[in-house]
Amino acid sequence: MLRSAGRVAAVALLALFALGCVSAAAKPSTDRLVAAIKSKNLSAVVDALSVKGLDVNTPDSTRRLPLVEAARSRDARLVGALLDQGALARVSDGTTTPLHLSMQGGSAAIVKLLLAHGADPNAKDKTGASARSTAAAVKELADLLKQWDARGAMAFEDEPGAWIREERDGQSYYWKPANGESRWAVPPSCAWQRVTVQGHPIKYINSLTGQETTRVPPALAWARVTAADGSALWLNWASRVASAAATAPAELPAELAAELAMHPNRRWYNTATREYVYTDPAYATPWRELVDEASGAPFFFNVETGDTTWELPAALAWTEVIESSSGADGESGSGSEAGPRYFHNTVSGEVAWSAPEGSRHVFVEASAADL
């Protein structure tokens, strides 16, 4: 009886294993896709990409990666088609990367596409050479690298508001009204997330390109405002574009969009520069006050330099002082009024008669009537 039960269990396990093998074997191959890429047949590539369940980051039966072969073809249309379907720009076949091939070939259009999707010009190939070191002597490539060095992948993102997100078959679908471009994979400008962890400074991470920043990226620089005629608008204060759409901009994650919608018309006036800002004055300096998890004591972290200190930084040490004026007889009476107003830095000892630029005192929260 026990032998019979064991035999049945073994047969069942073998059946499950066989099903697993069939399932694995049934996974769509990229052989047809790579063949279409090698022949530079765009319509065949589009047809191969339409196969349900296809993973464009899977090598074919001869270990060739679709995006590497597309870069080798020097056809920007093929590279763009793969990136639109979720191909990873940072991929490597163990020998080279798409960016190495495009840099060597002087293909500026492809290089821009790859950098925009997270390719790293400092990544190395099998020989240890970085992609930037193999670049052909082409001015356009030098300009692209200069932009990347200054701002990273976000230098090549679409302008905020360029994409519209819709739901189709339970999936997010993106299209760009300006040129009719459409894609299922999230565009780089729509892949930003705000990351908040207790005891750590807020940071922003692009889930597609991997770029991180402690400052609000242009893609997320949206505010909910009320126009002069009373209509509600989404305003991108970084790029100075507005959207009258009822739905939140495609760049905003749902949680952040809901938070902004709850606090419409919130902004601050900088009395020094005479400009309005939409970011909390608490972030006017790179210093953030955090709490040490072990001791519970406060400490300060500089998001730009990475420095930490237990002492209050001078940039945060400005206090406003208002002296009371005394009466004509030199005594302060019950009817005394506010006297001279100045600012004192408790760390550096400096004194200023006007609110120091960069301190929280220079900002005044604006009312809705100021809009």
UniProtKB/Swiss-Prot annotation:
InterPro entries tied to this protein: Ankyrin_rpt (IPR002110), Ankyrin_rpt-contain_sf (IPR036770), WW_dom (IPR001202), WW_dom_sf (IPR036020)
Residue stretches of each ANK repeat: 62-91, 94-123
Protein name per its UniProtKB record: Zygote-specific protein 3
Gene3D superfamilies the record matches: 2.20.70.10, Ankyrin repeat-containing domain
Signal peptide: 1-24
Known glycosylation sites: N41
Keyword presence, NADP: no
